[in-house]
């Protein structure tokens, strides 16, 4: 039995490493330039702060760490994305075993995620959505340990607070997971009386809030610009009564569309799709809280506000759907059909990078076809003809100026949009189109 378990663990690690290698190599070989969101994160990372006009700071922080190690090597940032994805897979695998107590089913729970395009096709672009993934999975894992233990361990509470704060500082929508977990514990402690309140829960909240304080101060000092940007992205300013029905319907249709390949793999694995919900089952209750409740809260947000929920915002929400469905259907899973499942899995595993490669090579007008290196070289030549010292800052939008900040050897700081004040305060500057380069 130990040999069998060791083999399954090895299969998981082979899958994880294969995923990491494939999705690092494919975009590295087929893309000419880093994607928009990654360039934005690098632009912010050149001038780190506790927040930025579009997002909280963590995606910029991790991007800058990798830049400090590897410099302007595109493959390093595709690798960064896949490290985050694979860490998430690892904690899904660990959690699945806690729930299922079967390594084969735990492995299947992770392999099912290959059918959800958030974890392959869109994963090369390191952004706030990918940045949430490992912390989402770790919060769920350590929350489960608290939920399933008779004695609450302080270290588990501490990890939930730390990873919850980092997740929230990656993207505010992380709050949907945290609220879902809170609602679960409130239900069990104050309504069902199935758990006792533990003061370590307060410590979790305190640590979480303390870690957010610098960002909250930054938000206040900057007129809550990040929050306003997020609200603008929902289309609330164009709201109408019909949006309270139309937007939730579109949201549901998109979620179903995303999961079609997922249900196809499930169909290959089971004898029949039949299950029943027993809310007295503590494991099932937890799985509903981390899988269904965050999506329901997102749907409820759309219904109440009429807001548009963008598809990519749902990136971390499906990490544990494999565990959820395998748990529901485990009595109907037919391991004799495992070969059919593996064929379907391998088909999707290779289909996604094949499509990515085809799109990347055949379409030549994408952001990833932007000649960032060439433009940076021309900008450097233009600067060098005027000045001897190196470039210290760039201004302009995150895309054009961010590419210059990334590709120029001096790694100039991105100072935001060009303003008269920045140029007046500089000792030297030149402007090329709508981008300016200068020295302090």
Question: Where does each model-flagged region fall?
Answer:
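Transmembrane-lumen/periplasm boundary regions of multi-pass, lipid-linked membrane glycan transferases
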Residues: 178-283, 294-299, 304
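Membrane-interface transmembrane helices that cradle and orient dolichyl/undecaprenyl
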Residues: 97-100, 139-156, 329
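Transmembrane-helix motifs of polytopic, lipid-linked glycan transferases
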Residues: 79-100, 137-142
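Membrane-interface alpha helices of multi-pass inner-membrane proteins
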Residues: 47, 156-172, 183, 208-210
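Short periplasmic/luminal acceptor-recognition loop of GT-C membrane glycosyltransferases, typified by
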Residues: 365-437
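Short helix- or helix-capping micro-motifs
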Residues: 16, 109-117, 164, 168
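Short acidic/glycine- and proline-prone juxtamembrane loop motifs at membrane-interface regions
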Residues: 121-132
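Signature aromatic-anchored transmembrane alpha helix within multi-pass, membrane-resident enzymes
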Residues: 331-359
